[in-house]
Amino acid sequence: IRVTVELNDPMLAEAFQSEAAVILNETQTVGDYTVTLMGMVSGANISQWCADVQESRTYAVVSVVRTDGTPLTEENYDVVPCGAFTVTPLVSGYDPRAVNVFTLNGACSSFLRDGRAYYVLDTQSLEIFSDHTVYLALYEGFAAPSYERFSLAEDGTVDLRDNVTGCMFTLPLDTHTADPDAARAFVESTGIPWEPMTDAQLAVQEAHEDLEVEKSADGVGNQTFLIQEAN
């Protein structure tokens, strides 16, 4: 994937030319745009910008172009990361707030070239989650992944909500690279609830929280009444 040369990272460019790279070129339509997941690669010491050469990272390249052929320029497209779109990995069976580009110490480089926008996603290695379905999601605007944008089915499958403009790709990771212990340690280290919740479970939780708020408000009201009586 030659666009990685734009990042001034010869090591990463070489990694994308190696046998370890997976070239995908999968395409989806998002509003007025055509989005292509070009490819991905995982490994240690494959980018000169990674301070720890022993740390394994995952990189993925996504391109965006207007479906009608109009070239993207700085005047008609916000190419900065999390400008027009947010790009993030997600993992089935995990709360989207716990496993995403932000919690995975990730970053996304972006630039315009020949009328297209390119995004290069860089995160901690996703291979530890490969015994689950691992997604790459792209959605409009800037916001951290949440249940407002994503829903989870009973089997842990993650999907965009109907009112969210975006798309999701499945990353073809080798299941033999999975490390459930490392995955568990990671999600617990975030301090964020990581067990998935369906819409039905979220509704029950919300109802319980509303009830607790009502009880708390009633308690304050009763205390005020007793104070007034005492006076």
Would you name each region that the model predicts?
Residues 2-231:
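Alpha-helical, hydrophobic structural elements that either
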